[in-house]
């Protein structure tokens, strides 16, 4: 009684108390899971083959899933750590790709809304654990590819939060994933190394199995993280992934014309010494 509290004073007090008593629900969730002896971890090296139905001998798919899961855990415990790759589930529509990601991280910590307003987008990235780029094959232009490449590359974002007066650098707590149907979703070959593609074809994901084994999967990722396992592919697997991504790159419009030209002229032109682009264009 007798004190006058201005709006500025009230806001500053609210922010001070919030910062002093900050709370991270995902940290608490993972720490409780880690200490729960009743939960037996899944095999971190076989998550894709066990739960997505990829071939058991497909080590690349299993390894891509493994580094994604470790990256999820690491971003929680080491906010803003380097994790510039995106796990992509490719397959027919309706097989449960997005539902897999939503179940995995929990609906409250999942987002698939790519806001056009950059500030809203950066705020959303700060409040989720898994951000899905749904229907990745819809982002077909070079501009789209550049924006997504920029999003994946950053480990912190500079913006002003609500009620704050100045911009500040905010380390990221979340990682990206993606889903797609078509096979030509990579518009920029220079940035394709960031996409780890697991091709499911038309295989339906057993979502009940994911729900029942979600905690085992996440606990396996926690244990792997605690052991110091990496959230990125080794050089051999990265080369395999980059080579595999060529199957999903958009064809340059000149390539089909060049193919037709070489095919139609195969009987009347000697190609053994090669040919120049000028020759192909003129003839």
Question: Language-model features: where?
Answer:
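Feature primarily recognizes SF3-like P-loop helicase cores of small DNA viruses
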Residues: 2, 8-25, 82-85, 112-114, ...
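P-loop NTPase catalytic core of nucleic-acid-dependent motor ATPases
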Residues: 18-130, 277
